[in-house]
A protein has these predicted regions:
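Glycoside hydrolase catalytic-domain context in secreted enzymes
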Residues: 1-234
Length: 234
């Protein structure tokens, strides 16, 4: 926002390295890092990624992935640290610690339950009970929010109990903020708010309704074109 002297926040995925530019180090995928069970090594890898990311002029990393992979058919298992919530919590926490030590914004994702889509179909209904969600899939997020100064968090594409996470006050307000005390900002996964107007969810007739639903749930930053649509802004 130039007239307010508010600079842009530049970001990168950085799931296993600063992948948006040539010359950066590409480290093993998260699943391989999880298999080491080595928090010290993981922290050092994250520190190296943090240095290279900041050197490139980027201040925010959309990682680590704290999804607990529960279905081998899911095509994004390699982005996760594994199938055990304790392992994901510990390795994910070490990763965040490494980022923060270098001054890099960290954005753990995808909150919540993204690692258990029905039939292994990415981004679809996760079909989890409240107990499964709380005792398995929310554990890593609760751990890092309570133990590290995470500045932001990315929500998931999925539905939970029939409600898209992009408009879920239960997940994004009641649990995340009121129960856990998270005081950072929530980023939408790319296109997730726009999906509220599509056949995938169809809880909104247009972008204005979609934006209102997402804002009411507590999503501050939109990866996509909904929040910056002219009609929405007006």
């Amino acid at each position: 926002i130039p007239h307010l002297y508010v600079p842009p926040i530049t970001k990168v995925e950085a799931v296993h390295g600063f992948s948006y530019g040539s010359g950066a180090t590409i480290f093993p995928q998260a699943l391989a890092m999880g298999a080491t069970w080595n928090k010290n090594l993981t922290e050092k890898v994250a520190m190296a990624i943090g240095e290279e990311t900041l050197a490139a002029g980027t201040m925010q990393a959309w990682s680590p992935v704290l999804d607990v992979a529960q279905d081998a058919r899911w095509g994004r298992c390699e982005e996760t640290f594994g199938e055990d919530p304790v392992l994901v919590s510990q390795i994910g926490g070490a990763w965040i610690k490494g980022y923060l030590s270098k001054g890099l914004f960290t954005t753990p994702k995808h909150f919540g339950g993204h690692g258990a889509p029905l039939g292994g179909r990415d981004s679809h209904d996760i079909g989890l009970s409240e107990r499964e969600m709380r005792e398995i899939h929310l554990v890593p997020f609760r751990h890092v929010i309570r133990n590290y100064a995470c500045q932001s968090l990315m929500m998931a594409y999925s539905d939970y109990l029939g409600v898209p996470v992009a408009k879920s006050k239960e997940l994004l307000r009641n649990i995340l903020r009121e129960e856990w005390g998270f005081d950072g900002f929530v980023v939408s996964d790319c296109g997730a708010i726009g999906n509220l107007t599509s056949r995938k969810h169809y809880t909104a007739k247009n972008k204005i309704e979609a934006a209102n639903q997402a804002l009411a749930a507590g999503i501050a930053t939109n990866c996509g074109d909904t929040y910056n649509d002219k009609e929405v802004i007006q």
